[in-house]
């Protein structure tokens, strides 16, 4: 079982979340003939302490969603929408405690739809970031870029993989994923 988990964790992590970029700045008619400018959302820099126990996040069909800017409702609405959408900056998506993806501001990494990927060490003391970045983050066991797996997601799902989003199915049974999720050692906040 331990060997299966060691093989399954990196595979699951490489296939997990999603991403999409928003627009830069737009100029809109404000209704009175004048123009107003809206700008891209400010970027967010993630620290190890930003990653919480999965049980502190909102579960959606087997993965977990949070937002570091307090936009949990907006992030969950995108995750639950059958039509997809673009996740707000600061959205955290995790399938298992050892990997995460965080939506960054437009321009962070267009190749990964502006998602930053993380490999994590989750312990009872908290989380340590092992690796982070865009499409260069590689799953240690599969040797594949996290972004390469997520790029198969249909565009409307913002780089988030699920059974109906165009991605290859995970080569790990759901019960193994659930057992990894339930073994998250991080304390609740």
Regions found by a protein language model. Give the residues of each.
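Sequence context surrounding c-type heme c attachment/ligation sites in exported
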Residues: 22, 41, 48, 84-189
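Short, low-complexity, disordered segments immediately C-terminal to signal peptides
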Residues: 20-39
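C-terminal motif of bacterial Sec signal peptides marking the signal peptidase cleavage site
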Residues: 15-18
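Bacterial N-terminal signal peptides that target proteins for export
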Residues: 1-9
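N-terminal secretory signal peptides
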Residues: 33-86
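Generic detector of short alpha-helix boundary/capping microenvironments
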Residues: 6-7, 78, 137
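Core hydrophobic alpha-helical transmembrane segments of single-pass membrane proteins
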Residues: 11-13
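Intrinsically disordered, low-complexity peptide-like regions
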Residues: 1, 26-30, 148
């Amino acid at each position: 079982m331990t060997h299966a988990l060691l093989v399954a964790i990196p595979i699951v992590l490489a296939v997990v979340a999603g991403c999409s970029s928003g627009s830069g700045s737009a100029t809109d008619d404000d209704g009175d003939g004048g123009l107003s400018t809206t700008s891209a959302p400010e970027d967010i820099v993630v620290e190890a302490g930003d990653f919480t126990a999965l049980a502190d996040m909102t579960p959606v069909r087997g993965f977990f969603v949070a937002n570091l800017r307090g936009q949990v409702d907006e992030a969950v609405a995108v995750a639950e929408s059958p039509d997809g959408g673009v996740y707000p900056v600061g959205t955290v998506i995790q399938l298992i405690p050892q990997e995460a993806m965080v939506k960054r501001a437009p321009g962070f990494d267009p190749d990964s739809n502006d998602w930053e990927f993380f490999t994590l060490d989750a312990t009872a003391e908290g989380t340590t970031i092992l690796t982070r970045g865009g499409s260069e983050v590689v799953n240690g066991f599969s040797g594949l870029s996290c972004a390469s797996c997520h790029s198969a997601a249909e565009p409307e799902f913002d780089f988030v993989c699920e059974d109906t989003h165009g991605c290859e199915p995970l080569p790990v049974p759901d019960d193994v994923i659930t057992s990894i999720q339930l073994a998250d050692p991080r304390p609740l906040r």
